[in-house]
Amino acid sequence: MTARGETPEVETREDEEQSVKLAEILELLVAAGYFRARIKGLSPFDKVVGGMTWCITTCNFDIDVDLLFQENSTIGQKIALTEKIVSVLPKMKCPHRLEPHQIQGLDFIHIFPVIQWLVKRAIETRQEMGDYIRSYSVSQFQKEHSLPEDQEFEHRREKAVRTLSETLDVYRPRRKYKRQGGSAELMDEESRVHSTLLEYGRRYGLSKQMKPEKPEDRKVPVPQGLVGKGEVKEEEELRAEEELRIKALMTEMAAMGMEEGRLTASTVGQIVGLQSDEIKQMVSEYAEKQSELSAEDRPEYLGAAQQHRRKVASLNKQIGQRKKLLDQLQEKASELQSGSCEAKKQLTEVTSHMENLEQELLVLEKVESKADPSVLQKLRDLVAQNESLKLQEQQFRSKCREEMSRLQQNIDSLKAAATEHGEEKEQSQAFEQQYKAEKEKLQKIRLLLARRNREIAILHRKIDEVPSRAELTQYQKRFIELYGQVSATHKETKQFFTLYNTLDDKKVYLEKEVNLLNSVHDNFQQAMASPSVRDQFLRQMEQIVDGIRQSRNKMEKKKQENKMKRDQLNDEYLELLEKQRLYFKTVKEFREECRRNETLLTKMKGQTP
C-alpha cells in the first residue's frame, strides 16, 4: 500500500488456454440452461461454482450451499464451498477427479471435463424427469377426464359387447332330444355322430363320396349312356336309406325340457377341481386312442380330411415342442446377454481405473520433474541402499538359518560322538561361544539397519515438508488475494477516519458559529441602548472577524502545503511507475536474450563434432 492509501496494481498473466476453457465452460452452462453465467458483473469463480451447483441440484443430489445472497465470498467460504462440491462428485460416480484447490485456483483445464460430464448428466436427468412428468400428467388426466371420442367408444363397445353376448346366447346349440336309457348301443362311429347331431336338431346325410364302394361295383364297368341314370338312382337310394336310418334313430330318442341336459353347479365344480394338466393329458390320450381304434376298425372310412386333421394335430404338437425349446433358448440367450452386460460393465470399470492410475502416474511424473534433482537422486540412492540392505539381510538370514541347521546337525552328531568319546562338554562350550558371537553380530546389523531406516524416514518427512511448485503458486495467489483484501479494508477504514475527522471539524465550527450568533443576538439590544456600549460591541465584533480571518488564512496555508505535498508524492509515484515499466521491459529483454543465448548454444553444440 502506498502512502496515500492506494492499492498497488499487481501484474497478472492470463493463460490463453485457461481463457479458452473458461469460455467453453460458460457456453456449456448457458446451453444447458444456466443463464446466470451470462451476467458480466459476476466473477468466473461465482459463475463456474454456481453452474456446478446447479447441475448437481438438477441431478437430484443435495449440496449444502447458498449462492443466492453470497456472491464474491471470502477465501474461507470459497474453500468450504469447493470442499462440499468435491465431496458430492464421488457420490454421483463422476469418472473425473477434481480437488478443491483446483476449483478455488480456477484451473479451468481440469474443471472442464467435470463440467462437461455434469452438463450431460443434468440434460439426461431433465429428459427422464420430463418423460416421467409427462406420463404422470397423462395418467392423471385420464383418471379425471375423458375425451368425447373415448366416451363414444366406451358407449359403442358396451353396446356391441351386449349385442354379441345376446346373439351368442340366442344362437348357441340347444339339446332337443335325448337317447332313452333302454335303447341299443350304437357300434359304429358314424351312427354315433348322426345320433349326437340329431339330439341337437341337426340332420346330415351321407355324401356321395362317403359311401363305401362294393367290390363288385368296382369291377363292373358302367356304359357311358347309363351313367346319368345310375347316379340319380344311387342318390335316391341313399336318400331313402338315410331317411330310414334317421327314423330308426329318432324312435330311440325322447324330447327334452329346457333345463335338461345342463350340468349342475356341483358337477362343474368337480370337473374344474381336477388338475388342468391331467385333463389335458387325458384328452390327448383319449384322442390318440380314438384315432387308433377308428383306424384299426374301419380303415376304409379314413378320408383325406381325417388324414389332414391327424397331420395338423401332429404338427401342432411339434410346434408346441419347438415353442418350449424356443423359450428355453431365449432364457439362455437372456442369461448370456446379462452376463455380457456384466462383463462389459466390469471392463468399463477396469478401463476407468486404469485411466485414473495413468493420470496419477502423469501427476507424479510432473511432480518429480518439478522437484530438486539432487534431492531426488539422493533419495533414489538411499532407497536403493535400503533395498540392497533388505536383500542382504534376507540373504544373511537364510545363510544364518542354513548355518544354524548345519551347526545343529553338527551338534547332534558331536553329541552322539561325545557320548562315545567323552568330549561333549568342551565342544558344546565352543559351539555356544560361536552362537553368541553370531547372534551379537546379527544384533549389530539389525541396529544399523534400523538406524538407516530412521534416516530414510527423516529424509522422507523433510522432502514431504518442502512445498512443490504448484503449492507455492497456490500460496502466492492466496497471499495476493489476502493482500488485496487487507489493502481494500485499510483504504476503506482510512476513508472512514478522514470523513469522521472532517465532519467533526465541521461540527466544531458550526457550534462556534451558533454560539457566536447567539451571543450577538443576546447582546445586540443592550449594545444599541447607549453609544459607548455600541462602540465596544462593534470593536468586539471586529476582533472576532479578525480571528476568523486568521483561522481561515491558517487553513488556506495548510491546504496549500498539503496540495504541494500531494503534487510531490504524485511526481514520485510517476517516477516509480516509470522505473517499474523500465524494470519489466529490462526483464523481458533479458529473458529474450537468455532464450537467444540458449538457442545459439544448442546450435553450437549441434555443429561441434
UniProtKB/Swiss-Prot annotation:
- Which PANTHER family does the protein's record reference? COILED-COIL DOMAIN-CONTAINING PROTEIN 93 (PTHR16441:SF0), FIDIPIDINE (PTHR16441)
Keyword Cytoplasm included in the entry's annotation: no
What are the UniProt keywords, alphabetically? Coiled coil, Endosome, Protein transport, Transport
| Its biological purpose | May be involved in copper-dependent atp7a trafficking between the trans-Golgi network and vesicles in the cell periphery.
Residues forming coiled coils:
229-459, 510-579
What this protein is called in its record is Coiled-coil domain-containing protein 93
- Cystine bridges: which residues? none
User: Looking at the keywords, is ATP-binding present?
Assistant: no
Cell compartments where the protein resides: Early endosome
What Gene Ontology cellular-component terms does the record carry?
A: early endosome
Output the superkingdom of the source species. Answer: Eukaryota
Q: Tell me the protein family, please.
A: Belongs to the CCDC93 family.
UniProt organism field: Xenopus laevis (African clawed frog)
A Gene Ontology biological process noted in the UniProt record is:
Golgi to plasma membrane transport
